[in-house]
Every structure is written in C-alpha cells, then in structure tokens.
Amino acid sequence: MACKVKWPFFTIGALGLGTLAFAGPIGKFLMTIKLLQPYQFRRIEAWLNPESDPTDKGFQVLQGLYAIGSGGLVGQGLGESIQKLGFLPESQNDMIFAIICEELGLFGAVSIILIFLFMIYRFMLIANNAPDLFGALLVVGVMGHIAIQVILNIAVVTNTIPNTGITLPFISYGGTSVLFLLMEMGIVLSVSNQIKLEK
C-alpha cells in the first residue's frame, strides 16, 4: 500500500519559500534598527542598488544581468557567450544560469526551468506512492533540497535576492556538489524502485 503524503506538508514548504518575497523589506528593517554589521549593510545595499558600485560590489550582478539581457529570445547560440570569457565572475558556478540565458535565450532558460519543474513533479509522485513514510520523507527532503537550490540560484542571477553562492543543481561546475546530488538521486531511485505498480 502506498504512503499517501499529505500535501499540507508541501504547503508549509511553499510558505517558507514565500518568505523570500519579503527579503527586501526585512533587510531594510534590519538596517534601520542596526542589527546588521557594516559589511552586511554594504552587501544588501549592493544588492538593492548594484549601479552604485558597478566596478566592485555590483560588478557580478550587473554582468549577470547584461548576459541575461543580451540573450534575447533565442540567444547568441550554444558556446557563443561573450560574458563567460572573463567578464562575468564565477560564470561556471554561481552565474551559470546567466550564461544559459545568454547562449540559449529566453526559450532555453524557460526550458531549463520546465525540466526542473518536471523533476520536482516526479519527486512528488514518488513521495506520494512511496511504500512507507520514511521513504516518502526521504524523497521530500531531496526534492526540497534541489528545489530550494534552483530557486535561490535563479533568484540570485536575476538579482531578486542578495548573492548566496548557491550552485544550480546538475548544471554548475563542481565535484562535491554533483557527487552529493547524484547520491540523493540514488536515494530517490531506491525509493522509486520499491513502489509496487498496480496491474
């Protein structure tokens, strides 16, 4: 018998992600009551207004936005990015989504997002049909980890939140990150393998 995960668990996670929408007002509030250190204040200020310091604090964000903007609808072409040639710092890690937008355009970026959404949908199906609660919770944990990484990376690249240094799962360069993601996928596939199909 399948373990039917109650979807209110997912709504709690969605509410947690919804608090990201209030990151700006919360940051301004913390600055006004002096809870932030000066370097933290400068980082948030560079996030809110990257044009105020375009050669230092706002450089990476602005170059990422230039890459996204220069991609247009269909992009420059695969491998034809200009920003990855030293203009955009960490273009292979934190800012890989900006390079995807530049090379593949809006259609490529939307395709990547749709692939991640489909993966998350499949995680939900596996969690919903898992044979026991433990397996369902394992899958929900992996799903949450990957979903949060995707949301944070894309939000940083589009300057929706301050820079966090989070990589884009399965796409960003990095040995340890990919290793742990593959281990997590192995856990999910193990739970999926235990699901009994109805005949």
PLM regions and their residue ranges:
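Hydrophobic, glycine- and aromatic-enriched re-entrant/interface helices and adjoining loop segments
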Residues: G13-A109, L133-F134
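Transmembrane helix-bundle signature of multi-pass membrane transporters/permeases
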Residues: F87, I99-E102, V142-I146, G174
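Hydrophobic transmembrane alpha-helices and their immediate junctions
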Residues: L106-V150
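Membrane-interfacial segments
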Residues: L30-M31, M124-P131, T164, I195-K199
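A juxtamembrane structural motif centered on a specific transmembrane helix
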Residues: Q149-K199
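Structural signal for the C-terminal ends of transmembrane alpha-helices
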Residues: M1-K6, F22-A23, L117-A127, V188-I195
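Membrane-interfacial entry segments at the cytosolic side of transmembrane helices
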Residues: A2-G16
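Generic alpha-helical transmembrane segments of integral inner-membrane proteins
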Residues: G13-G18, V110-F118, L182, G186
